[in-house]
Each structure stands twice: as C-alpha cells, then as structure tokens.
C-alpha cells in the first residue's frame, strides 16, 4: 500500500500582516535607527571618545551581520537569479572582511596599537612624548598636523591625548602610520602663547616604507613600534 506524501503548506505573508507587523514594531525600529543615526553623525574622536568607540563597534558589526544575511539569502533564495546574486554578495563580503583583518594585523604589527582594528580608517597618527607613544586614528593623512598644549593638556588635531606636558616636550617629528608605509612630519613652526600654552605645526616631510628611530635613548626600538601606547 503506497503512501502519499502531503506537501508542506506554503506560508504567504499578506499585506495586512505586514502592516500589522510595522505598526507593532515601528516605534522600536524608529528608536534603534535614531540611536544609530546619532552615533554615526556625532561619533568623532575630537568630541567624545566614548561615543566614537560605540560608533566603531557598530561599524565593525556591519560586516558579520552582512555576511550572515547574504548566507541566509543563499539558503532561502527565491529563485536561481536571487541565488546567484546572493552567492556573489557573500563572496564579496567575506573577501572584504578578510582584507580588513589582514590590513589591520599589518598595521598592528607596525604600531602595536589596538586602534589598528579601527574599521573607519587605516591612518594612525603617532606622537612620542617623553618616551610615551600616543596613537590615535585620523580619517586621512593631512599635509600638516597641529599639536596644541593648553595649560599642560596635550591635543593633536583637536584630540586630547594627555596632561602634564609643556612645549619643550614636543618632539621634532611625528608620524602617521599606514598599512604599507610610514609618513613622517617635521616640526616647522612653534609658537608659545602665555606661560603654559602654545602650538606646533608639523609638515609632511617623508613618505616611505621605513621606520623612524626612537627618541628613547638606548631603547633600540622604533617610534612607530613602541608598545606603551595610550
């Protein structure tokens, strides 16, 4: 006696159900999107480091979420055309994520800073202040960099780095580390404002795949490779 297999019912989402779903989740989705928009809009290192870190976490999570969604589309493709596009998008997303990790690891080897895994930029400005290396991300490699000291507080490109410094502590060179090379900036102008404030302008002087000798005497290390990063 042969048995007949009953096909599984195909569930279709009606327009009324879609409208009901949007009505139920519209408020929550709006709050989430507003939160992400505010973080992406105002997340800058010169404004709030805490907000900027949250922004970096959101950007970093975009890659695995994208890969998960593209794989999901491959498994539940509507037809062969959708399947083909989903496979291509999955491969592209995975390759780009691998490239990101490779570049980040190369930059980490050069700088020793966890800022190397910043998903927004591969440019890290480095300044050696009395043997302590400060590393912070910048969007692009500018032709000039400005270092400011206001009553002992150290700022570089508007980003606060530390306290307890004077103009005499500023180095002759600062660097911007990239994945494949290092940019050296030479101090071209120094101006003192009052007793404890002033600024210095550094101009790009060299670009190449080399390392700048450390200002620490007897350390034998390179400026862009010091491990005591802040």
Curated annotation (Swiss-Prot):
Keyword Disulfide bond: no
Compartments (UniProt record): Virion membrane; Host Golgi apparatus membrane
A single cellular component GO annotation: viral envelope
Ribosomal protein listed as a keyword: no
Transmembrane segments: 25-45, 56-76, 85-105
The protein's assembly and partners: Homomultimer. Interacts with envelope E protein in the budding compartment of the host cell, which is located between endoplasmic reticulum and the Golgi complex. Forms a complex with HE and S proteins. Interacts with nucleocapsid N protein. This interaction probably participates in RNA packaging into the virus.
Name recorded for this polypeptide: Membrane protein
Protein encoded by which gene: M
